Amino acid sequence: MEEDKDSDTLQILNDIINNEPNLEIYVKSKNNNYISSRELPTQDSSTKTSNITTPNNNNNNNNNNNNNNNNNNNNNNNNNNNNNNNNNNNNNNNNNNNNNNNNNNNNTPTSLNSSWKSVVPKRKIDTSSGAILNNNNNVGSPNNQSTSQTNHQQPPPQQLQQQQSLSSTSTPSISPPMLSPSRRNVTSPNLTRSDPTVPITNSRPTSPLTPPLSPQFQLNNLNFDDNNDHSTTTTNNNNNNNNNNSNNNNNNNRPKLMRENSINKRSSLQTLPVSSSSSSSAEDEILIKVWLPMEYTGQLYKVRKFSGGSSTLKVSSMLNSQLSPMYQSPKNKLFLNNEEKPIPSHLTLKDLSLSKYDILYLRREPEYELIIPSSPQCGSLVMDKDIKIDDMLIKIEHWLKDILDHAPHSTSQQQQQQLQQQPILHVDKHEYFTSLEDQQLMSGHITNSSQYTLLKKLSVPTSNSRQTGKMSRGYYLRLYDQKPISNYGIKIKDTLIFKKKILNRGLSIDDAEGGIEITVLYSPLSMLPTTSDLDFEKELKENQQQLNNNNNNNNNNNNNNNNNNNNNNNNITTTTTTTTSSLINQTNEILLPNLIKIDNTSLLQDIKNEKKKRKSKRTPSSVGLPFNIIHKTHVDFEYKWSGTSVEDTFEFKEKLGQGGYGAVFKVLHRETNFPLAIKVLSITPTRIKDIEKEIDLLKKCRCPNVLSYYGSISSKLTELWILMDHCAVGSINDMMKICCDTLDEEQIAVVTLNVLNGLGYLHSKGIVHLDVKAANILLTEDKQIKIADFGVSQQLQTEYGQANVYIGSPLYMAPEVILKAPYNSKADIWSLGITLIELAEGRPPNRGLRSMNQLVEIPNMPPPKLSNPKDWSPCFNNFLATCLVKDPVQRPSVIDLLSHDFIKNAKTTEVLSNLVKQTLSSRQSI
């Protein structure tokens, strides 16, 4: 039987030699003598040889070829079974049986010696396509295939008959021989190239052991790729008896395993089949979180799909083109997680190694850009991110000089001389002040006030009754001249009103009549989304749902892997499986960051415990509760309002006033008709921590003399609404201004008693207010006195606190706070003494100080006192002197002051009835 195999092999070699005149093969005999193929006698089917051996693979340095040779030898029987005809259907169904495989492969040459060599001068044979690669005529290419066929000689009829006899007598397990293109078209018309589009390369093996003109070939079983259709019956059998491994691999989008060629490896320049390339391109897509502030619709980001090989320049150009024409700009660049520097344009998305927590920001460098929709001919105005309002007003005047009725505002010569003579003090650190006058005092000079003002339209709903003329009056926030624009949370699509100043009492609604409407085209604050409106319960649900999805996906993947392992025990080698799985794992880490398996069960248990803790958490007793308002499901344990829209929940009535960072409005709760006060604050990077601290302190306070906190609402990206008690009268300072009168001694005593009660409660909680003054003492319609404004309050973790910057109002600061020395709750006692002088005389002492240099001298000055002490009782004078002790150690506490005779003799709040009625009537008439 072995002699028959050798004769068939020799016959195949003779057929190749007869069709290739330039091909000469040397055969090594048993005597170690090389015999040329031209000297060999013609062999027929009865010729028997047993001296031909297979080549030695040890000289091949290509590791991939060695692995593939081993795979082919191990799976030799299975590969041959896939090419059987209809006559061997039973054998194909039992392709895992080694006995049947050996019986079906009787004609396979297995007794060839390992020293067979061939010499091919300047040629290379590719059996998958039947093309001679190094031919000058590009044999095997689609364009020159017909030309190559004519250049080859047709085989004689005798050889054709021999081939037909061989094909009819041999078993189907014998693989077709390597044929030239001309012979292949005659004998095997069904044999076609596995991939005609594969380019043909002229490269040669680069192994140092391979001579340039005599490349070594390995002679394995002459098998073609599975893509070659040998006959119709073979194709049907292959489809019916296809291995389950290939089906599972296709379902997992893994690259199809390709068998190695019989003589040489497929060229590295050849492409994969179309199905494999399409699957790889699908895996190459990446889902990315993109922040587009110009398209903000309530979500912090959008998910877009891009190719992993796309450069950041291409992605930014694509996103920029999808914006509306007004927001398209060549300045837009990509920033990873809102970093300061943009992403280099040459990097690809795969190079960034994005995770599910990363967000790409499409923005430009920090700056402000303004446009006028009604006057597009004016173009746009670009300003620095740290510009102040007064400088901004001057720029806008010059920008709009063509459409203004008069020339830009210019200062007089006397005012310019005064400005030059007045020194400007440089403040190294950021100082927090609560009023415009305090800011001017600390800046070291009185700046020139412009005749124009700038208003910011707030996102507060207005009713139809407020429509006056062409423009809605709405609700606007005045921007103070000495404040930087970054303090007001100006963002993209905000509306500003540029108009002349109108003198008023500061209590009426600012309207936009006669002003020019300006739209913010770009703002750096739009790049800073906050998570204040994110619900913890919602986040836990999303995390739990994601973990459940991941577990389901992992279970499905494990089931598929088990099926694959059961079906692929005899079909896939260990090397190929390891390589494919490693590639897929690396791809999943980069392209599918959301599908991450979490094996840490303790983490899941912590999340569940935290969720149960949140649900079972009761309202702390230290939180100010709205006792006379009905709360429904739209208020959570953190007092965050959600559910219905703000417009449907509250009805805005009027603007009560404003400060340096926000405004206060009176609203009605529609369901209960209960009045509330909403403080609208602009969220900025420098104010986020202060606002969060203020809310945290409000939630911890439950006292009749402390302003109650009803919750917070995140209406938009850079605005936060704080719900508080509505004090219809307003502050003591507003009441004195409206009534044009100060308080008498009885009224001061009752106010002091209630303030001490509130301060005593705060100090018991470790909270230092640090900004006690008449403007922060509020009165309700029922004559209840409450302490408000915790914007600069501090909760001391130790006995003493340290102030590194000036905190509070400068004229009310305690000496230790001015000197930036350690302080404690007794700093509020000093501020209370200054407030009592303000209530008695209408203004605080040391009002004539004009600079910080003079203010620093307060600790060295004698304690302040009343201007006319004789007009007041000795008890009141003694109480003031007790509060205004410069040494904090000698200064009394709240408990000590409550035992003073001035407080013991205090009456009820009915002594304030006349002032309260006068104030309410004046407010209603406005």
From Swiss-Prot:
BP GO terms, sorted: chemotaxis to cAMP; intracellular signal transduction; protein phosphorylation
Gene3D superfamilies on file: Transferase(Phosphotransferase) domain 1 (1.10.510.10)
Reactions that this protein is recorded to catalyse: L-seryl-[protein] + ATP = O-phospho-L-seryl-[protein] + ADP + H(+); L-threonyl-[protein] + ATP = O-phospho-L-threonyl-[protein] + ADP + H(+)
Composition bias, Low complexity: 56-107, 134-173, 215-253
Deleted gene: phenotype: Mutants have an aberrant response to waves of cAMP stimulation.
Keyword Magnesium set for record: yes
Protein name: Serine/threonine-protein kinase pakE
InterPro entries, sorted: Kinase-like_dom_sf, Prot_kinase_dom, Protein_kinase_ATP_BS, Ser/Thr_kinase_AS, STE20/SPS1-PAK
GO MF term list: ATP binding; metal ion binding; protein serine kinase activity; protein serine/threonine kinase activity
Annotated GO CC locations: cytoplasm
The organism of origin for this protein: Dictyostelium discoideum
Residue ranges annotated for the Protein kinase domain, each copy included: 650-903
Presence of keyword Methyltransferase: no
